[in-house]
């Protein structure tokens, strides 16, 4: 089967997901220059905070419209707030209730940007969609692979690992072959309103507010004890959901007699007892894992795991590739690392690579300690 991307650009209608940022703006411009029939689409995925200081949707829509007006393309708008609530946000809350630390951006990409948006674009008569993600695609016969973005500082394949090959085959990634400074320079050269706009950071629906303030609107806090690894009570937490493995800030521990000056870190969340276990030192042994179990694995394309495979993996965004051996066991997918991994966090994602190819990944269920715990 020939990939849709291999058609004549002049006969190919592409709808670009316009976020109001510089990356999607330049993506639309580049596709225009390549001869595609280009239109834009602005997605509204969150409605809870309309009219508040935290919601930037109006500003983002205005920026997207300004860019579309500048380059002379039509801008569609679509409201996917209901789909986002049902397929992303409710899962986000359930994970926090379970004491885990989820990554909603990964689910948003799979369920909204490469499902709801793709379906909507196809219903408008599009042949392909495009986004401003820093990833690349490679077509090999009937198979479309997801590759890391050329800019190692901006590569976003970690966040797109749960998107299937069929969806990738329907998508163009114009800035994936560029580095960020090049993208801004192109936007500046063409007078795009988003040329100097700051990149968005953090979880989209939280904005600039404190995470704990946001979360307590939806989940009741359950305060409990903070204990050392020896079981000594040294403080109280406001709720396990506010903390993640490896966290240093916001523990409220200080001035303890004979404790020394080394900072305290979250080592473990004991969900059964509602206890936050902490220890001192960035290199505390409890922070390191030798292996992990993952579930809910999504492969971009099916892979053969009839025998263990040596791959590389990331257990967090921006982490360098870590060599591991992946095997399918009765308990799930088990990755054993060559080197100890710090702060492996249940609920976060582990993403597997073969060189520059992103194979897929899944949710971390448990981490196995690097050294035995008493």
UniProtKB/Swiss-Prot annotation:
Organism lineage string: Bacteria, Pseudomonadati, Pseudomonadota, Gammaproteobacteria, Pseudomonadales
Binding site for ATP: 17-24, 43, 132
Disulfide links within the chain: 108-204
One GO CC term on file: cytoplasm
Interaction with target base in tRNA as annotated region, ranges: 103-105
Family: Belongs to the MnmA/TRMU family.
EC number, UniProt record: 2.8.1.13
Intracellular or extracellular location(s): Cytoplasm
Annotated function: Catalyzes the 2-thiolation of uridine at the wobble position (U34) of tRNA, leading to the formation of s(2)U34.
Site feature location: Interaction with tRNA: 133, 348
GO molecular function (one): tRNA binding
Catalytic activity: S-sulfanyl-L-cysteinyl-[protein] + uridine(34) in tRNA + AH2 + ATP = 2-thiouridine(34) in tRNA + L-cysteinyl-[protein] + A + AMP + diphosphate + H(+)
Identification of the protein by name: tRNA-specific 2-thiouridylase MnmA
Main location (coarse class): cytoplasm
Residues annotated as catalytic: 108 (nucleophile), 204 (cysteine persulfide intermediate)
GO terms of biological process kind: tRNA wobble position uridine thiolation
PANTHER family: MITOCHONDRIAL TRNA-SPECIFIC 2-THIOURIDYLASE 1, TRNA 5-METHYLAMINOMETHYL-2-THIOURIDYLATE -METHYLTRANSFERASE
